[in-house]
Regions:
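Short secondary-structure junctions
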Residues: 1, 155-160
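Active-site-adjacent mobile loop/cap segments within catalytic or ligand-binding domains
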Residues: 123, 159-222
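Short beta-alpha junctions and helix-cap segments that line functional grooves
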Residues: 3, 101-102, 165-167
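Periplasmic N-terminal soluble interaction domains immediately after the signal peptide in Gram-negative
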Residues: 1-11
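Catalytic-core regions of hydrolytic enzymes
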Residues: 9-11, 21-146, 150, 154
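Intrinsically disordered, low-complexity polar regions and short flexible loop motifs
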Residues: 17-18
Length: 222
């Protein structure tokens, strides 16, 4: 079917308008506040891969890219740490360090989501894939975790180990929907190389932001 010249011009106009409108459409995360928690840091390296890649560095890099993208979307990002430091104080105990991260969230009543970023490790280097953890203290924890997991699996291309229930301290003691993502296994040489790559880190951050946008787009609950 051939579109007449005049009509064809109008179709092109509509297409251009649609594209412009789509670009100008504000992010669903706009105006919302998210706490981002890069795991470990300072005196705690977290997992360390065979090539020496440290979990604390990957977590911080992905968290900072996520922070940047959220700001671009008009959202507010609160970081539990922005540098390679202990959140509580140098050499603080694990419970005190975890509570310090929770305290950052509790100090910001405007915060609506808590996202903790980690990498995995196992004694067997064949262990692979990404996964997301939640603790069902609100109606939305599992839903938030599911969105994160779906977007990470699609963007990262790693084996999807699914969403899992866990009693991690930061998931239980925050008062808002929270999830903890394990981006991949540093104990797996192939995944370690990916997780150290800045372009891959940015791709993961984009996935995290898409999940956050979907969460707010859907009104916060499934």
């Amino acid at each position: 079917h051939t579109i007449p010249g005049e009509a064809h011009g109008k179709v092109k106009e509509y297409l251009i308008i649609d594209i412009i409108t789509a670009k100008e459409q504000p992010s669903a995360a706009r105006g919302h506040t998210v706490v981002i928690d890069p795991g470990h840091g300072g005196s705690d390296s977290g997992a360390v891969g065979y090539a020496g890649v440290r979990e604390k560095d990957v977590a911080l890099a992905v968290a900072r890219y996520t922070e940047e993208l959220l700001h671009e979307a008009g959202a507010y990002a609160i970081m539990t740490r922005t540098e390679d430091v202990d959140v509580a104080h140098v050499g603080s105990s694990a419970p005190r360090e975890l509570q310090a991260r929770v305290d950052v969230s509790l100090a910001h009543p405007e915060a609506e989501l808590f996202l903790s970023v980690h990498c995995n490790s196992f004694t067997n280097p064949d262990a692979h894939g990404m996964e997301t953890y939640y603790y069902p203290k609100t109606d939305a924890d599992e839903h938030f975790a599911a969105l994160l997991n779906e977007e990470l699996a699609a963007a990262g291309g790693l084996y999807n180990r699914g969403i899992k229930y866990a009693k991690f301290y930061v998931l239980r003691h925050t008062e808002i929907p929270a999830a903890l993502v394990e981006l991949g296994f540093l104990s797996n040489p192939e995944e370690e190389a990916l997780l150290a790559d800045a372009a891959y880190q940015k791709r993961l951050a984009q996935a995290l932001v898409r999940a956050i946008e979907r969460y707010f787009e859907q009104g916060g609950e499934e």
